[in-house]
């Protein structure tokens, strides 16, 4: 993950400045217009009774840069829920974990899939194929040397809070899962 961040201009900047998403970002987001990315973030966090400060600190990683990369991975998880349009059902959480695995290569996403699979009905399990396709289409990619879909750790989410949600979607190139599923139903 560190190498992917170092290979991207925005990622290098994030590693240099190491922004931390704190409770003040959530407080700021609560006052934003309903059409903004930040408002959706605040609504998600409040609905689930989450606080950015509630995440357990990264431990057992001696290298400070690698420790920050893991901190960023954890802090960006809530932003991934917002940009992908996924809630917190088991199915949606598994979709997010597949998405994260496609972006980071961390096996945690696949392990979550294995752990969550027994809790899924046959119909829900059938949806996993669609989620896999969606995550694959939203994996980091580039066109003509420029990121078409950046690795989500390289997105300056903390700078996106006041932007319109649709603008952030366009910036990231990520298709929210509900939009993907709606298009699939039409075809």
UniProtKB/Swiss-Prot annotation:
Coiled coil residues, start to end: none
Membrane-topology descriptor: Peripheral membrane protein
UniProt keyword Ubl conjugation present: no
Pfam families: Coq4 (PF05019)
Pathway: Cofactor biosynthesis; ubiquinone biosynthesis
GO cellular component: extrinsic component of mitochondrial inner membrane
Catalysed transformations (reactions): a 4-hydroxy-3-methoxy-5-(all-trans-polyprenyl)benzoate + H(+) = a 2-methoxy-6-(all-trans-polyprenyl)phenol + CO2
Protein name: Ubiquinone biosynthesis protein COQ4 homolog, mitochondrial
Family stated for the protein in its record: Belongs to the COQ4 family.
Location(s) in or outside the cell: Mitochondrion inner membrane
Extra facts: This protein may be expected to contain an N-terminal transit peptide but none has been predicted.
Role this protein plays: Lyase that catalyzes the C1-decarboxylation of 4-hydroxy-3-methoxy-5-(all-trans-polyprenyl)benzoic acid into 2-methoxy-6-(all-trans-polyprenyl)phenol during ubiquinone biosynthesis.
Protein origin, superkingdom: Eukaryota
Single GO biological process annotation from the record: ubiquinone biosynthetic process
Cofactor requirements of the protein: Zn(2+)
Subunit and interaction comment: Component of a multi-subunit COQ enzyme complex.
Binding site residues for Zn(2+): 77-78, 81, 93
């Amino acid at each position: 993950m560190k190498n992917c961040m170092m290979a991207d201009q925005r990622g290098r900047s994030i590693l240099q400045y190491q922004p931390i998403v704190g409770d003040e970002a959530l407080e700021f987001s609560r006052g934003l217009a309903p059409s903004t990315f930040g408002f959706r973030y605040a609504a998600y966090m409040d609905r689930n009774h989450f606080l950015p400060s509630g995440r357990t600190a990264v431990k057992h990683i001696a290298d400070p840069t690698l420790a920050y990369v893991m901190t960023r991975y954890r802090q960006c998880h809530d932003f991934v829920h917002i940009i992908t349009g996924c809630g917190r059902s088991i199915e949606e959480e598994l979709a997010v974990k597949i998405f994260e695995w496609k972006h980071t290569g961390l096996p945690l996403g696949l392990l979550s899939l294995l752990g969550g699979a027994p809790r899924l009905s046959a119909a829900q399990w059938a949806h996993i194929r669609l989620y896999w396709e969606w995550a694959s289409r939203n994996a980091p990619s580039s066109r003509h040397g420029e990121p078409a879909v950046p690795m989500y750790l390289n997105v300056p989410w903390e700078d996106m809070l006041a932007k319109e949600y649709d603008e952030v979607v366009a910036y990231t190139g990520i298709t929210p899962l509900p939009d993907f599923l709606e298009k699939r139903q039409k075809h």
